[in-house]
């Protein structure tokens, strides 16, 4: 993980650690001139590692985004941001996306009153995300909520920390994306691969 954040910069979904300021200078001095291919590859890797996707999963999302109306890059980011594991991370119910994945895999999360154990579940507006009604599930979420830095919630989400309940209000707006990335470079990377 630390090699990845040193090479690619801060990835809040992967870890809360940040690269040291001195390591950035060393990377720039060592790397020399960066080719266009390398720049596109690094942007793609940033996206992949932040959301914890395999190459194949990311390629599938790029194809879905390409078929949808609108800007492919913007639709791609919306698809990734509306995944259940990412929604839990953005609500503060988990400190990282891998932590959110564990909550989903161990069946601690309910969506609209039903247990969902599919990480890639695509959240929709008016989805209500809660924990199971047992002590262990609530203790896990309470622990994450107590220790997570209280950042401003994106406007497409609402959180009630006392009832351990989150609400998806709408599809995410592009200015609330949690990662500094040029999505057009990712789309370019994949368009040149085919």
Swiss-Prot record:
Pfam families: Ribosomal_S4, S4. One of its GO terms (molecular function) is rRNA binding. GO terms for biological process: ribosomal small subunit biogenesis; translation. It is found in: Plastid, Chloroplast. The keyword Amino-acid biosynthesis does not apply. The keyword Ribonucleoprotein applies. Signal peptide: none annotated. Keywords: Chloroplast, Plastid, Ribonucleoprotein, Ribosomal protein, RNA-binding, rRNA-binding. GO terms for cellular component: chloroplast; small ribosomal subunit. Disulfide bonds: none annotated. Residues 82-143 form the S4 RNA-binding domain. PROSITE patterns: RIBOSOMAL_S4, S4. Part of the 30S ribosomal subunit. Contacts protein S5. The interaction surface between S4 and S5 is involved in control of translational fidelity. Belongs to the universal ribosomal protein uS4 family. One of the primary rRNA binding proteins, it binds directly to 16S rRNA where it nucleates assembly of the body of the 30S subunit. This is Small ribosomal subunit protein uS4c.
């Amino acid at each position: 993980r630390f090699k990845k954040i040193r090479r690619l910069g801060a990835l809040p979904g992967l870890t809360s650690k940040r690269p040291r300021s001195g390591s950035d200078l060393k990377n720039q001095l060592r790397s020399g001139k960066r080719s266009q291919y390398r720049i596109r590859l690094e942007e793609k890797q940033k996206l992949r590692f932040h959301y914890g996707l395999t190459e194949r999963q990311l390629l599938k999302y790029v194809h879905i985004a390409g078929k949808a109306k609108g800007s492919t890059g913007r639709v791609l980011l919306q698809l990734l941001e509306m995944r259940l594991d990412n929604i839990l991370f953005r609500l503060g119910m988990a400190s990282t996306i891998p932590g959110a994945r564990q909550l989903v895999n161990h069946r601690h999360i309910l969506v609209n009153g039903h247990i969902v154990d599919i990480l890639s579940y695509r959240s929709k507006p008016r989805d209500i995300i809660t924990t199971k009604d047992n002590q262990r599930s609530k203790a896990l979420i309470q622990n994450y909520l107590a220790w997570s830095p209280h950042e401003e919630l994106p406007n497409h989400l609402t959180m009630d920390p006392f009832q351990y309940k989150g609400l998806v209000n709408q599809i995410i707006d592009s200015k609330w994306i949690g990662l500094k990335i040029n999505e057009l470079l990712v789309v370019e990377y994949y368009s040149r691969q085919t």
